[in-house]
From Swiss-Prot:
Catalyzes the transfer of the phosphoribosyl group of 5-phosphorylribose-1-pyrophosphate (PRPP) to anthranilate to yield N-(5'-phosphoribosyl)-anthranilate (PRA). Binds 2 magnesium ions per monomer. It catalyses: N-(5-phospho-beta-D-ribosyl)anthranilate + diphosphate = 5-phospho-alpha-D-ribose 1-diphosphate + anthranilate. GO terms for molecular function: anthranilate phosphoribosyltransferase activity; magnesium ion binding. Mg(2+) 1 binds at residues 91, 225. It comes from Lacticaseibacillus paracasei (strain ATCC 334 / BCRC 17002 / CCUG 31169 / CIP 107868 / KCTC 3260 / NRRL B-441) (Lactobacillus paracasei). The gene is trpD. 5-phospho-alpha-D-ribose 1-diphosphate binds at residues 79, 82-83, 87, 89-92, 107-115, 119. It comes from the Bacteria. This is Anthranilate phosphoribosyltransferase. NCBIfam families: trpD.
Amino acid sequence: MIKQAIEKVVNHENLTFEESEAVLDEIMNGEASEVQTASLLTALTAKNPTIDEIAGAAASMRSHALAFPETKDVLEIVGTGGDHANTFNISTTSAIVVAATGTQVAKHGNRAASSKSGAADVLEALGLDINETPAVSYESLQENNLAFLFAQEYHKSMKYVATVRKQLGFRTIFNILGPLANPAHPTHQLLGVYDETLLEPLANVLKKLGVTNAMVVHGRDGLDEMTTADETAVVELQDDHLTKYTVTPEQFGLKRRQRADLVGGTPEANADITRRILAGDHGPQRDIVLLNAGAALHVAHPALSIQAGIDLAAKTIDDGKAFEELNRLLAFSDKRKDVVA
């Protein structure tokens, strides 16, 4: 299959969903050579992958992932990375705030690739066990409304492309597959992307993958998040319909900030920023978390406007519930470590 797929893509022909899924199956099963894998990835990058090609590849990744117990109405807050902004862990902090409102969040993430601190790095620095089994993570989702699914534990088949990706050295389809391959199969998703041209295609991919409500966002300062330093371009998926619009921080009563105010550092430094935000510190870092948490709450509960989501996120922090959520997660993690020990 991969030989035919390479020939097709080299000739600027598109693969169907089924063809893309089948060829990724070959790669994920270790049946393709590194030369073949590199050829396909290079040809896809040169052509630009279509919605069907991305969705088929994501479906393959999901099917090869470690199984996660079935969930219902679960939210994911994630970015593609690759914006080279070195911000603190905005999505992860926002996920904790959203979980504290009683909304279930299955956060799928990894260690840092293009930044200094990925979701796994900062959660580990906060004191959480990032290597929990699917059963334990599911238990955390039910008890604490938040589960972390460590990508490298769930996607063992990625070992077949790791060397090729590193040696190619440029972005490939795999740079956008990670946020689409959550084994918890979220039905609601806030997805940040590094390039505005990805907004509509990835919204359509999410639709094909069974997501019912989503916002795909790109900060015009370059962030793969909702940003407080510039406008944010949005494509929203709701009721099978896509809507494009732009938002500014000012329309939600938030100050426009400098991107330098949002820069993080090491996992330990970012963990400290997260703790301070959850404990109620005010300032630029809180504001961007409120904006992203508010958008995520709107995605999870469409009847709630983004503004109402921001207000709920602020109240959740100010009432101490967000910090309580972090402490619950830490206590749960410690308890499970003791059981294993």
